[in-house]
């Protein structure tokens, strides 16, 4: 996953805006709702890469 990628969290697509370093315990990501622009923080383990196929 890279900044700017579309990812899936709780069944919805979000834009990945930030990642905590791999060395951080309980790593989190920052996500942006592409429809509203609202930002969310989510556990890294709950976010998956979007597959287009």
Residues covered by each model-derived region:
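Short coil-to-beta transition motif at edge beta-strands of beta-rich domains
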Residues: 1-10
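Intrinsically disordered, low-complexity, charged/polar segments
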Residues: 32-53
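Short beta-strand-centered aromatic/proline hotspots
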Residues: 12-22
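Coiled-coil-like amphipathic alpha-helices with heptad-repeat character
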Residues: 22-23, 45
